[in-house]
Amino acid sequence: MLSRILALADTGAGAESESATSSATTVERTWDVIVWNDPVTPMDVVVVILRRIFGYSTGRCTQLMLRVHHEGRAVVWTGRRQRAEQYCVRLQVAGLRCTIEQAT
C-alpha cells in the first residue's frame, strides 16, 4: 500500500527553490504549501512522502514532520502558485492533508 501511495506521489521533479520575481509592471506573489497534522498517517510515512515529493534530506523532512506533529501544521515549500498547487495535489494523492495560501 505504501509503495502504491509513493508511486502516485512520485510524479514530477524534485523541489526547486523559487522566489518571487518582479518587473516594472507586475509582482508575482509567493505561495506557501502547508501540511496539516492528521491522526492517521504515521510519522515515518510523512517523512518518506516529503522526501519523495520535495527531494529534501531525511533530517529536513523529519524536522518538518515534527513541526506538523507538534504545531498542527508546517510550511513545507514556498514559491509560485502553479507549482504550489502541483505540490499540494501530489501531497494529497499521497494521503496528506495539505493546503496553499499566500505567503506573508
Regions inferred by a protein language model and the residue ranges of each:
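Terminal domain-initiation and capping elements
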Residues: 1-104
